[in-house]
Amino acid sequence: MGRQAEFWSESKNNSKIDGQPKAKARFASKRPNGTINTHPQERMRAANQQEEE
């Protein structure tokens, strides 16, 4: 194995998952009124309902 491959392999195997998550609430997608889509299954069910005339 070459020197470059050894370095890459070491850095990949030594990666840590400890610490704070990188995703932050301030970057979450929100609607213009400030709400977020917390119940997508309900929305999908409502979209598939047949409208009765």
UniProtKB/Swiss-Prot annotation:
Residues 1-53 are annotated as: Disordered. One of its GO terms (biological process) is sporulation resulting in formation of a cellular spore. Keywords: Sporulation. One of its GO terms (cellular component) is endospore-forming forespore. Induction: Expressed only in the forespore compartment of sporulating cells. It is found in: Spore core. It comes from the Bacteria. InterPro entries: SASP_SspK. Its main location: other. Pfam families: SspK (PF08176). Belongs to the SspK family. This is Small, acid-soluble spore protein K. The lineage of its organism: Bacteria, Bacillati, Bacillota, Bacilli, Bacillales.
